[in-house]
Amino acid sequence: MKLAFLVHTSRDYEEVIEMINQLTKQGDHVFIMINDNDLRDKVAFVYTDYLRVHVSRTQEYAQEGDLSLARGTIIQMKEAIEKDDFDYFINLTDGMMPLKSRSEIVAFLSEHEGKDFYYDATADYDQVVLNKKSKKYYPFTNALDFPRNNFLRSLSKASGSFFSMLGIRRKSEE
């Protein structure tokens, strides 16, 4: 069974390297989006010749609270499908590692073949904080240059906070 781990991180160098090494140790692939430019370059350099590590370059940055993380994950999946035929994608957020061994993960996925699994983070996360972040309106995140342009990212955060103070929020049906 071919597994692809989709990761978004802004951790320090040692943690990122250790995570990648652990995830690729048993032959799995890692598609990683790193928010820090210097860290991204260091990791890309270290794994230049390692075919199982793919540092995201199409979208290099994702901001919490807007759709750039969802878009980045979809781009990672698209790039993964173009490289190989993966059976499952496992999405990990910053600092996460699988608690089960690869054989236990494969056995579980084989037993429940064709089903999707997800973890509802709202059970462990302060609902007020989550609602505040999800309702904040961040402009410019659909701009093609958003992931690479520090000015646009900063302007988006500042505008989001300003709009929030004015009571302008993202509309949601839920």
Can you describe what each PLM-predicted range is?
Residues 1-174:
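ER/Golgi luminal nucleotide-sugar-dependent glycosyltransferases, focusing on the catalytic module
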